[in-house]
Amino acid sequence: MRRRQVIKLGAAAGVFGEALSRWAIAETNRLFEISLAQFSLHRTYYGEHIEKGWVHLSQLLREDPAAAVAGGPDPADFAMLARTEFDIGAVEYVNQFYFAQLGNEAYFKEMARKADDHGVVSHLMMLDGTGRLGAIDAGERGDAMEKVKAWMGMAQLLGCAMVRVNIEGEGEPEERAKRTSESLDTLGEIGVGMGLAVVVENHGGLTSNGAWLAKVLSLAKHPGVGSLPDFGNFRIGKDAEGKDIWYDRYRGVSQLMPFAKAVSAKSYDFDSAGDERMTDFTQMLRIVLDAGYRGYIGIEYEGRQLNEFDGIRATQRLLQRVRAAYSSNSHSRSGFVERADTAFALDE
């Protein structure tokens, strides 16, 4: 690495070291705080449009994004809703609910004011529809980074600590990992001037292979780049018979935790005891806490067994219950966290 690059990364590390509290919780007696991901309410916001299917909704979001959310509650009031309905004090916005507002600085400043008025932290913004950061064509990658940059400006107005990006791409996994890491480093540097970190989530396809995503993040050298491990997004494809292929979620989260700046507690369905049926939250939160993570853990309910409001509350109760159990047991490190390997396999 050239001396100029070393100096540049060193300066960035200083910036993010000073700003660490923006993505970590304030000093409390709790092991973690709970945030609410706006996508937990996607059926509430999209209403009849989501019932018509994702193809219909995707087209509407491209052609008339304001109409897509016109029938539900105002997305601008999300922070207020989080506080008044659930008494949750931190939120994770989703940009697709605001596609029609990109560039409208007054709109996002007003959202920030509403959040402040209700004592709600604008933790992060999840970005969709911004292009392929792992594309082979350099021009396409550049266009994608410009789209991300535009949304980073909106997240900055909200007072967010970070943005979550997607890293779609193509080509051989090794080369794609290298291209993607370079895009992430560029975005990480852009984020320095905005006070924003850039995080990547396991979000389907190759990104749901925990070893591959850990490889990408180990190649990315910027201190403002990290991960957002999601408890449930580990479906990596389908087999010849059309059955889903899943990466082991506990191993995947373990591999991503060394890079974590945020965590997403995905939930779908609950048993009579209030436990999530697909993910053992006790085991998963042990992995998270053993990594030394003490930031926000975001509720992201995507089930249909309960309505979205009840699903959020069920996830909230489960997180609170497990947190209380670990707190009373003086949680100790068990060494469960798996460090990122440099190799990865696509057939796991």
Residue ranges of predicted features:
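N-terminal pre-domain/capping segments
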Residues: 2-157, 175-178, 185, 192, ...
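Acidic/histidine-rich catalytic cores of soluble enzymes
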Residues: 48-49, 90-91, 181-287
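Conserved beta-strand positions in the central sheet of alpha/beta enzyme cores
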Residues: 90-92, 124, 164, 264, ...
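A short pocket-lining beta-strand/turn micro-motif at the edge of beta-sheets
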Residues: 261, 293-299
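Short acidic/polar active-site loop segments enriched in Thr and Asp
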Residues: 88-89, 161, 294-295
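Active-site groove signature of glycoside hydrolases
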Residues: 155-175, 194, 199-203
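Active-site beta-loop-alpha junctions enriched in small/polar residues
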Residues: 39-41, 94-96, 127-130, 168-170, ...
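A short helix->loop->beta-strand "cap" motif at the edges of active sites that frequently abuts
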Residues: 120, 196, 291-295
